[in-house]
Amino acid sequence: MAKRGMLIVLSGPSGVGKGTVRKEIFSQPGNKFHYSVSMTTREMRPGEVNGKDYYFVSKEEFEQEIAAGQMLEYAQYVDNYYGTPLKYVNEMLDSGKDVFLEIEVKGAMQVREKAPDGLFIFLTPPDLMELRQRIINRGTDDIDTINKRMKKAVDEIEMMQNYDYAVVNDEVEKAAEKIKTIIRAERWRVKRFLPDYRKQLGELN
């Protein structure tokens, strides 16, 4: 039976660059992470691809998935649902593959409760003014939505204490490399290393 894979959760406030950093990690040679595509009810942005960036569904479809217990986590953010389908994540982990989630902070806290052995990384901006400018530069939100996102961001940064590691996204390439370094180190933590040895010892007895 394959050793169970590691669940890696990257989250942070809206506009911090989670998607950009995740894409940088996945674009590098030798990448073996499996990206769990999130589901959302928000409208597709220019350049996004259904099934690659997100699964874009209606509110009714999303709520049906919730009712059926098919979401690992979900949250409602600025009037839209975001969440992670459960089936794919479990299939990948059980087959020994490492699964990479890029999700909202509220959703990450739900995953923390259900999968406490996951690796939780908080991506943070250099400062709040930089975060506001990044949201404005996206050109997808009106001023009211930008203000909502900033208020939410302040609350989310306070939740950083619930994560294992924090990475400042001042430069995408540097942030991606820091995250890869964290993951490499995490593999050798005793709590991840010891279960396999105990299993081997049990087989000898």
From Swiss-Prot:
Annotated Guanylate kinase-like domain ranges read 5-184
Any single GO molecular-function term of the entry would be: guanylate kinase activity
EC number, UniProt record: 2.7.4.8
Transferase as UniProt keyword:
yes
Give its localization: Cytoplasm
Annotated residues that bind ATP are located at 12-19
Q: Name one GO cellular component term.
A: cytosol
Per UniProt, which keywords does this protein have?
A: ATP-binding, Cytoplasm, Kinase, Nucleotide-binding, Transferase
For the protein in the UniProt heading, the enzyme class is transferase
Location (main, coarse): cytoplasm
Concerning PANTHER family, the annotation shows: GUANYLATE KINASE, GUANYLATE KINASE-RELATED
- The name of this protein is Guanylate kinase
